[in-house]
Amino acid sequence: MGERDEDTLFRPGFNRAVRVEAARSAVTDDAGALLLREVAEQLGYDELAASLLDHRAQHLVKHPLTELVLTRVLLLAQGWRDQDDADALRDDAALRLAVSTRRGTAPLEAAATALTPEGLASQPTLSRMQGMLASELNRRRLAAGVLERACARMLRAHGRRDEMTFDVDSFAYDAHGKQEGVAYNGHYRTECFHPLVAYSDTGDLLAVRLRPGNVHTAHDVRGFLEPMLPQLRTVAKKVWLRIDSGYANGQLLAWLQHRGLKFITRLRNNPALSKEAKTWRERTLVEWKKGPADDGRPRQSTFEYWYRSKRWTRVVRVIAVLVERDYAHGELLHHEFFLATNAARREGTSDDILARYRHRGEGEQRIGEFVNDLAPTLSSVTRSREGSVAHKRPVGAGENEVSLLLAALAYNLLHALRCLVEGELGLGISIRRLRERLLKAGALVVRHARQVTIRVGAARAELWAVVGRLLRTAAVAVTEVHA
């Protein structure tokens, strides 16, 4: 068959025998969405979507709410961050199969009626869904769904543990245009939102809450924590919280003590803290100045005492930490910081508390993944399907919080799948690498009379076989739990 120039997309100059054209058969770059949908089924995402309030006239609904939620979550998980991407991917066979609530080959068939979905929902439809989910009731249910499904995964993977640790932190979420809640943050020096986020020591995202950009780090942290506590206690008998110095105020620490949480927080350096540790510090530095450690490694030393700030109602256990930074040309450099905890010594020595706190960096890495790899777009105005500005209505804070909550569901899908892969391969893997190696798989979609075959490339076939086996085993475990 002869070539037609109008079909040619690209012909490289380095090899004119190569010709690139658009596939006329059903080809997808997102076969991994089918794996994610399987994980979503096991975690009960369909049940969560069914619990959300849908105020549309159901006899006129073309795309069920469950399909709309799955569309947005799976697109985010696959790396499609803009709602507009749904229009470009409307006919992608793997995505149509993954988001549909219909079985068999029905998701790929032509619409039988005007109300039968044919392809993915359009950008305007997804935008209206997000507005519908922005009601206070739906946001509460979404937030509860994020937490409940994260805890369910942890229980399924680890059982009820003796103890768990979770981190609370905030981050700057850059925003542009006229949006409710966007404000200048002096610490981050940018116009942004200032959300709170909580992560478990297993890497699961527990909660996220949108806040105005100009609020203090600790603003409403008690209101953020309170709904989580009953659920977290189903996961572990003892719950530890790690927080940074921005949260270390007397009222919050007293409340954490009252609610039965073990906390470890960093304290801002101040003269009073330093004075208490002066003798220990001087003695330690005298010893260190005798010469570097025999193995050449930086040394550290801890010292603990009881301390109460003038603004606090009770004393806390403080651990002063001295860390050697460098030793060159006879000059010793060091760094000093302070931790506070309500844990008794029988629950952890100074070194134990320090080691536990240092894992906080892992939570910060998870935030980086959430922001950089999920990165939901927070639109400033409502747009038409063609992308032109329809009108200048600012998007409400509720709608932007929905964006973060849906991104949290997408993150936890990816993390649940990552945990399966890591357990099998015995090595850590980032979300970006997970997409590259597994999810962003090119495949040929072959439709038969009663079934659909997805043919992935040979380079990914072995890993797909492994993950398929793991998901089948996980599905059996879920069935046994529900039996």
Region spans (language model):
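An anionic, glycine-rich sequence signature occurring as long contiguous blocks
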Residues: 3-22, 262-371, 472-483
